Amino acid sequence: LVMSGLRLPALPRAIWFFHGSPHNNIRLDLHTPGCGWKAATVDANRLPAYLLAPTLPLAVPLMNIRPMYRALWPVGQRAIAAREALLDIDMTAWHTYQLDWGVRGAEFRVDGELVLRTDAAPRGRLGFVMWIDNQAMVATPWGRVGWRTVPIEQPQWMEIGALRIESAMR
């Protein structure tokens, strides 16, 4: 691993297959739960997000009111290019995961089946990270933020049969 040294904090930019335990609530998409096995993208380092930032002190408390959340969050969701799809698969079985990410968007596939397509994928360089942990995070549009560790009651593991990373201009 090569780390690039100390840097200022950055706004979230991610494109991933991600599992959040029931203790998590990272709700990026209006219609997708904040936990579970997902395909997702987010890019808060975009001009629309910066333009919307001055409204946060008013918008975040208002989103605690369900009708306001339904009205306001889609604007925020578009601004941070958040897209998610819950994956209805057995995580303990072998699967082939594919992520095609280009300048015009991204497509996520599981076992060859398209599970998420977006035209607003993160721009710029990102690193490949694969991990397993026992952390839980809460980060909601209505202002709930928290972090904790979750006790592990049984062995945890991640198995990879093959990994291929290719770079291509699209």
Spell out what each predicted region is:
Residues 6, 20-22, 33, 104, ...:
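Generic structural motif
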Residues 124-170:
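Ligand-recognition surfaces built from glycine- and aromatic
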Residues 1-70:
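Secretory/extracellular carbohydrate-interaction modules
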Residues 36-49, 71-96:
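Short, aromatic/His-centered strand-loop micro-motif at the edge of beta-sheets
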Residues 93-101, 106-108:
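Short tryptophan-centered beta-strand motifs in secreted/extracellular beta-sheet-rich domains
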Residues 120-121:
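Residue-level structural signal for beta-strand termini and adjacent loop
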Residues 109-113:
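Short strand-turn-strand beta-turns centered on an Asx-Gly dipeptide
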